[in-house]
């Protein structure tokens, strides 16, 4: 009886570990590429940043295909897609994420920035309203971007 319990727990642990680490690995690798891309942007190394965003996007697409509708994955898919110049598709990823979690801080900030970049300030203000109660730097950043006091770094 005890050995059957031990075997079933070992099998269960093995199956859950492999599926979750796969998602984390692709997602984590993508996040690393995004962080490096942001550093390249700060140094005006635009082409190097673009290549990193492309790598990140590819990993995020793979992760989203295998494990769809993870809000953080959709947030970064929206971000990388926007950074690669496809605002329309980036917006779709953000909106898909908001259907799952309408108060997601990252999505609301980045989508607000996208709306400012595409001259839809009224929609950016709506994102700001969602962030109003978060007591977070994302609220302050988006507020400053909407007011024209700050330019979006990303």
Predicted regions and their residues:
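Terminal, low-structured helical/coil segments at or just beyond the last alpha-helical repeat
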Residues: 15-24, 125-154
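Structural marker of alpha-solenoid helical repeat scaffolds
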Residues: 66, 100, 131-134
